[in-house]
């Protein structure tokens, strides 16, 4: 846990009512901060959006930065959970990639403010910005490395590959989903996956240049 996270460690409510109220505040923060930006969003607006008294906010979060950090962590957890559930039981890495990308785009279509929230994290709290991407990459790296061992995909640096694939997801989603406010067209998704399949395709080791043929 980073220093900034330790300073803002927040005890989660134990009652069902408390958890509902906390989630309402996080949902409101996603809407307000995603729309207005962190600097222009206010706690008053967040509580009004959530339908709770302003004082209620401070029962759950000490300040606006704290709710922002929790929002980033909540979005990260929800995204990773949805992808994990979608690919559970799948064995083929290329199929996992296809289902994983579909799930990512469905999630970002549902949480349209995710892009803006995560981009702002770099300037609000750099530690949580790095944590978001590293946490997302951790499982990805493990899965890619396992697929390389099974010779399902070509052998590359799994961390480098994970970040390349994450970059594809982010920018394709931004161009064809966030900017147009519509789901990604099937033809764009298919072309993206054709590129990924070609890049990941397993290549048996080539013979040495000096090998003699019969």
Where are these regions (language model features)?
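Basic, helix-initiating cap at the start of DNA-binding domains
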Residues: 1-36, 44-49, 66
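C-terminal peripheral helix-coil segments that are non-catalytic and often amphipathic
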Residues: 1-9, 93, 106-110, 142-149, ...
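An amphipathic alpha-helix adjacent to DNA-recognition modules
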Residues: 19-27, 39-40, 51, 59-84, ...
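Key DNA-contact positions within bacterial/archaeal DNA-binding proteins
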Residues: 55
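Short helix-capping/turn signature of helix-turn-helix
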Residues: 61, 118-124
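Hydrophobic alpha-helical connector segments
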Residues: 70, 81-110, 161-165, 189
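Amphipathic alpha-helical packing segments from all-alpha helical-bundle domains
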Residues: 77-81, 125-150, 159-163, 171, ...
